[in-house]
Amino acid sequence: MSRDICVVVPTIREYECVRAYLDNARDHGFDTDRLFVVLVTEDFCDAEAMRAMLDEEGVAGAVFDESDREQWYDEQGIADYDHLVPAASHAQTSFGLLYMWAGDFEYGVFIDDDTLPHDEWDFFGTHLENLHHDGEVEEVSSDEHWVNVLYQSEADLYPRGYPYAAMDETVETDTTETDHVVASQGLWTNVPDLDAVRILMDGDLQGQAQTRTDFEDFDRDFVAGEGDYLTVCSMNLAFRREVIPAFYQFPMDDNAWDVGRFDDIWSGVL
């Protein structure tokens, strides 16, 4: 089978998480020859060690620190626009989108370097199954036209990016038919992805939420109803080539504090 999946991992920390995802693929019989791993890192990180890891794992891929990205922009004739993908920011994930667009990959997968797959779940295979889903699926909507992706949990959590004004919504579920899925949003166990205010409400001044999520919090797949929005977290996401532009992460640090933590949640909105 052709190498049709571009796996984008922005990393300045635990880049060896890639080994766990590759082990998961092999354990579940997923063909790793389909994968091309793009590690997006910085000049102060050990890019050579990352390249050595990809070689050891026998997987195709490339590592781009800031200098490598500048060279790539020059080669593509787009150096004048390099500021649209900020360095040393999670929004550098957008470089992986550009690389994927310039290639002939049919699918993209985002992975954060502080995550690991569950051994019992086929990470890549499940995402691809979702993208090829054809048939019935649960449809979720609300009277606020926002869907809380954690609505199945009994913990009453709202993920980072969910509007405060849309909380306490009335959730409605139905069954619909779908034959064209463009994005598969995975969820996460253990530490939930909350914003600062919700972490303080659920946790303490140490910046750590107290609630933990587990298997029982996510027991079935669903799609958002037509006309409803939902939040997107790019730590566990697969998508088709046709929607690459929707996942561009805008630079959000153009302010007096140089703070830009809301990069990925605005994908597809602005």
Where would I find each of the regions flagged by the language model?
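Short, charged/polar "capping" segments at the starts of alpha-helices
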Residues: 15-18, 43-51
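Acidic donor-binding loop at a coil-to-helix junction in glycosyltransferase catalytic cores
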Residues: 256-266
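Short aromatic/hydrophobic "clamp" motif used to bind/position activated sugar donors
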Residues: 108
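Active-site-proximal specificity loops/subdomain of glycosyltransferases
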Residues: 46-104, 120-133
